């Protein structure tokens, strides 16, 4: 089984969006591994665990092919773990991009 964390932060990410405490300022300054997105993981390239608002960013940063995703396990319905609006673009009949012939 292949398991990869895509995001490991709390509901607002890290550093916090509107915070200027010393910890958030330090994280902003250092960047890299000090910047964390909302919680998400992927199993075997075809099952997502949670679907946060950062899913699109996770795809871009990792370069992963999310067209292989077939399942999504939502751990709970809080808005930091489940933002279903992007799922609309995966529905049949929604063509926001070029589709390949089957």
Where are these regions (language model features)?
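Extreme N-terminal starter segment of soluble prokaryotic enzymes
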Residues: 1-4
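Cofactor-binding loop segments of dinucleotide-utilizing enzymes, especially the Rossmann-like FAD-
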Residues: 8
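Arg/Lys-rich, low-complexity, intrinsically disordered N-terminal tails that contact nucleic acids
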Residues: 11-13
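Pre-active-site segment of Zn-dependent metallo-hydrolases
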Residues: 15-73, 77, 83-94
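Short internal beta-strands
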Residues: 97-102
């Amino acid at each position: 089984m292949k398991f990869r964390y895509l995001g490991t932060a709390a509901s607002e990410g890290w550093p916090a969006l509107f915070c200027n405490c010393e910890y958030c300022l330090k994280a902003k300054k250092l960047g890299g591994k000090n910047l964390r997105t909302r919680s998400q993981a992927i199993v075997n390239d075809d099952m997502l665990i949670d679907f946060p608002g950062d899913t699109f960013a996770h795809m871009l940063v990792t370069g992963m092919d999310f067209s292989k995703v077939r399942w999504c396990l939502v751990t709970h319905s809080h808005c930091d773990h489940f933002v279903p609006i992007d799922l609309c673009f995966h529905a049949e009949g929604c063509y926001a991009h070029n589709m390949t012939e089957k």
